[in-house]
Regions:
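Glycine-rich beta-alpha junction loops
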Residues: 278, 320-323, 342-347, 403-409, ...
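Active-site/ligand-binding-proximal alpha/beta "capping" segment
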Residues: 315-343, 350
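Residue-level detector of anion-binding/catalytic polar loops
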Residues: 270, 335, 398
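Solvent-exposed alpha-helices and their adjacent loops that cap or buttress functional pockets
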Residues: 149-151, 167-171, 186-187, 238-243, ...
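Long, compositionally biased, glycine/small-hydrophobic-enriched stretches that function as flexible linkers
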Residues: 1-198, 202-217, 371-521, 525-538, ...
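Small-residue-enriched alpha-helical segments and adjacent helix-cap loops
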Residues: 535, 539-570
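Catalytic or ion-translocation cores adjacent to nucleophile or general acid/base/metal-coordination motifs
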Residues: 205-229, 233, 244-247, 253-313, ...
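Generic recognition of flexible, low-complexity loop/linker segments
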Residues: 237-238, 258-261, 327-329, 387-389, ...
């Protein structure tokens, strides 16, 4: 397809003449069939809802087709409308547009649907089993058409993948405002999502899937590396200074979990990651994100012993069920140093977790046709997995929950994960590592995308970012010196670690000052021509301020407000009028529908004075909103960080807590008994 044909296809939106039906591509990784949850009347409603995108002359043809999709897959994806062109992040100048910011959004959307990047690209799912960009291909086509027509004085409104339309606004307003899964709280259970998604009225956007900010497995790899490195440091003794020879065991080689073997290599450990889906494991192997693949435990166990004995730095994919792996390691009495889990347990009944002793294919069939039995099998598997993990922790393994709802779903299954006082026996990685060491000080997963598509532009941004961090490190207080040292090392090595999958993007943990100064350095490089095209700034929702999630991002909030969502909602509102190009707010990212409120932004930096103003105003708020909240929760690192920010920033006045003596209160209450 020529560039002109591609641009014409974008501008056409939903074609008046229906394209030919598409064959089902068995080479692509597909979403499992969703369980049939709709009543006969609701099935009628789902098809009527889908037909709203098409003129009446096509209804007879499409109604029959959509009924078949609903029966066969549990959803209406409108496969017929899937474009014929290759889906990937093109250079920004190849997108037809009246507004360059809109072209940047188109680039980000296509990256999320690139088959090299997305988990189930033909079902418009980027990662996590159900993290969707759109619900169907009509929504994709109509959204791209609107973006091609948008001016700097319009805003596109997105309701859970549905483009509501272009509305008049102004150049400083967001170009796109995204909501995903925003439902009345009483209707936020997993089956509510199944029903509303099948009806075509809501979707689960995960974190960066439905917000157009996914950058492949790189998006989580810096955070995963930080976690593995600091978990390993907790095990250092006797003067040990590196992690070589340590064994890290986990599961998942999907969109986010696929970062684990690369993080293991960067951290210097032997990592063994189980993955039930052979296509997912093969994809990560071909992309260079895992070194070796093995589908036999009899072959894997001696290889693990050999690698640990030789202090190799190597990552291995076990293509099989994670429960089998844990049970074999426990039985063989192999010394596992670090353990975790990154199965998609936010989505346990629809492909996020596969039960032991049932094949991958049989599981996919069972979850749709026998959902109650599938649920029983999953819960039995969780109990067995936890039993094996408990045996290994009794021998000294450090196990941490990665915020994927593993401990939550294991507890619901009756697994032995509870400790004293009704608390989990294992910590969340945010409680032990990420929260007190990083989030409380404002460090989080800042990211950027070079819209030129040129590797040399990305290399320049890496150098600029490293220079900024080194300048900050020269005068930084001791309490954040270690974090800065690790982050400087990370960005210096990023190119050599071959992290790019899809768009020319980079992830870097940075605090408020670091993010702002790095973004300003990019803007200057654009203004003087050193960078050839705009840069998109963003972050994961898994950050200081963007997400209220009691089992992950806010699990180290102990004042009782961990179940509130004021921070995430305030954050997206504040970003929207301080210069974000697009903003998003979602239900359920990471831990699951009904368990989380999470949001994010995208900002197009183009070398202009307006861009510099937006950088200064928005990035300050986007980080310090969360630090202020964490400070009010009496987190010591956050109290220190927000005091430092108030000294640095004129006009910033934050309410600080007066910390009461807990023993004083307990004694007074005893007096009144």
């Amino acid at each position: 397809m020529t560039l002109q044909e591609f641009q014409n296809d974008i501008r056409a939106g939903i074609p008046d003449r229906l394209p030919a039906a598409k064959p089902y591509d068995k080479q692509i990784n597909h979403a499992p069939k969703r369980k049939g949850i709709l009543t006969p009347e609701e099935e009628v409603l789902a098809i009527r809802n889908a037909l709203r995108y098409f003129p009446a002359k096509h209804h007879a043809t499409l109604a029959r087709e959509f009924a078949e999709e609903l029966r066969k897959y549990g959803r209406i994806y409108m496969y017929r409308l899937r474009p014929d062109y290759e889906m990937y992040a093109r250079p920004i100048d190849e997108y037809p547009c009246r507004c360059r910011q809109a072209a940047a959004v188109m680039l980000m959307i296509q990256n999320n649907l690139d088959k090299a990047v997305a988990q189930h690209p033909h079902e418009l799912i980027t990662y996590g089993g159900n993290g969707a960009v759109f619900q169907n291909w009509a929504q994709y086509r109509l959204t791209m058409k609107y973006l091609s027509e948008m001016t700097d004085s319009q805003t596109l409104v997105m309701y859970s993948g549905h483009p509501l339309g272009l509305f008049p606004s102004h150049p400083d307003a967001p170009r796109v405002v995204v909501t995903n899964g925003m439902v009345i709280p009483n209707y936020s259970k997993p089956d509510d999502w199944e029903r509303m998604n099948a009806l075509g009225v809501s979707q689960y956007g995960q974190m960066t899937a439905g917000s157009y900010m996914y950058i492949g497995p790189q998006g989580i790899v810096h955070g995963t590396t930080i976690t593995v490195m600091n978990a390993a440091r907790k095990r250092f003794s006797g003067g040990r200074k590196d992690a070589r020879g340590m064994l890290f065991v986990s599961s998942g080689l999907g969109g986010m979990s696929g970062a684990q073997p690369k993080a293991g290599n960067i951290s210097g450990v032997v990592s063994v990651i189980a993955e039930i889906n052979p296509k997912a494991a093969q994809k990560r192997y071909e992309q260079g994100w895992v070194d070796e693949m093995c589908d036999s435990l009899d072959a894997l166990v001696p290889r693990i012993r050999e690698a640990c004995r030789a202090r190799e730095v190597v990552s291995m994919a076990y293509v099989g069920n994670v429960v089998d792996l844990w049970e074999r390691l426990a039985a063989e009495e192999i010394a596992v140093d670090l353990g975790s889990d990154q199965t998609s347990l936010h989505n346990p009944w629809a492909g996020g977790y596969y039960p032991v002793d049932v094949s991958y294919e049989a599981s996919n069939k069972m979850m749709a046709e026998e959902p109650a039995r599938f649920r029983e099998c999953v819960q039995e598997s969780l109990r067995r997995q936890v039993d094996a993990i408990n045996k290994l922790t009794a021998r000294g393994m450090y196990f941490f929950d990665y915020g994927n709802a593993f401990l939550l779903e294991a507890s619901r299954a009756g697994a032995a994960v509870m400790g004293e006082g009704g608390r989990f026996r294992y910590p969340s990685y945010v409680q032990d590592i990420m929260g007190p060491m990083f989030f409380d000080y404002g460090f989080g997963p800042f990211r950027w995308v070079c819209t030129s598509g040129r590797p040399e532009d990305l290399e320049l941004t890496d150098r600029l970012a490293a220079e900024v961090l080194e300048e900050i490190r020269a005068t930084a207080p001791a309490e954040i010196a270690g974090q800065l040292d690790d982050n400087i090392h990370w960005i210096r090595e990023a190119g050599r670690n071959r992290l790019v999958v899809g768009s020319q993007a980079r992830i870097l943990y940075a605090d408020s000052e670091g993010r702002t100064r790095i973004a300003q350095a990019f803007n200057r490089a654009l203004a003087d021509g050193r960078l050839s095209a705009p840069v998109v700034l963003g972050r994961d929702h898994h950050d200081v301020s963007g997400t209220d999630s009691p089992y992950r991002e806010t699990s180290n909030i102990y004042d009782g407000s961990n179940l509130t969502a004021d921070m995430a909602v305030q954050n997206v509102i504040g970003d929207s009028f301080r210069g974000a190009t697009w903003v998003s707010i979602h239900n359920g990212g990471g831990v699951g529908w009904g368990e989380v409120i999470n949001g994010g932004f995208g900002m197009v930096v183009d070398g202009s004075e307006d861009a510099d103003r937006h950088i200064r105003e928005m990035l300050l708020w986007d980080v310090n909103n969360g630090i202020a909240r964490r400070s009010w929760a009496r987190n010591e690192g956050a109290m220190s960080a927000i005091r430092r920010e108030m000294e640095r920033t004129p006009g910033l006045q934050v309410t600080l807590p007066n910390v009461a003596d807990e023993e004083l209160i307990r004694n007074i209450l005893k007096e009144n008994e």
